[in-house]
Design a protein with these regions (language model features):
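Core catalytic region of metal-dependent phosphoesterases/phosphodiesterases
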Residues: 2-95
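Structural motif
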Residues: 5, 32, 102-104, 123
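Histidine-centered divalent metal-coordination motifs
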Residues: 10-12, 72, 104-106, 123-126
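Hydrophobic transmembrane alpha-helix bundles
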Residues: 67-77, 103-116
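Conserved beta-sheet core of the metallophosphoesterase superfamily
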Residues: 84-88, 96-99, 106-127
């Protein structure tokens, strides 16, 4: 199975289109989104082509292909409009004898690792 991994769209229709173009080009089976889907947060500038309603429509059209974890800018109001789960703090995928631990990065990251074995993989965004 081929996964396309992305993070931190922050409501940018421009980057969401780029994501979906890459998804089609790479012929990926699934998308793993590492949070911060719709909102940019009060500390951040508006992203390029900030249009969360467009992002909602584009991603909901692919809801069956998306696995997502919650970012620090994601909330229950976002879950009300997205038709795929976004509220998990992390997900764990089996990979051979190890795991892939996917999270947003605001709790666990290189400086604060989750419990991992040698050979396990940590994926995070929070860019």
């Amino acid at each position: 199975m081929k996964w396309l991994i992305a993070s931190d769209l922050h409501g940018s229709a421009y980057y969401c289109r780029k994501l979906l173009e890459a998804y089609d080009l790479e012929k990926a089976d699934r998308m793993l989104l590492l949070g911060d889907i719709l909102y940019h947060g009060p500390r951040n500038d508006l992203p390029t082509e900030y249009a969360p309603k467009q992002v909602i429509a584009m991603l909901n059209a692919h809801k069956q292909d998306i696995l997502c974890v919650r970012g620090n800018c994601d909330g229950e109001v976002d879950q009300m409009v997205l038709e795929f789960p976004i509220m998990a703090d992390y997900c764990v995928l089996e990979l051979g004898k190890g795991i892939v631990y996917a999270t947003h990065g605001h709790h666990f990251n290189e400086q604060n690792l989750p419990p991992l074995h040698k050979g396990d993989i940590l994926l995070h965004g929070h860019t």
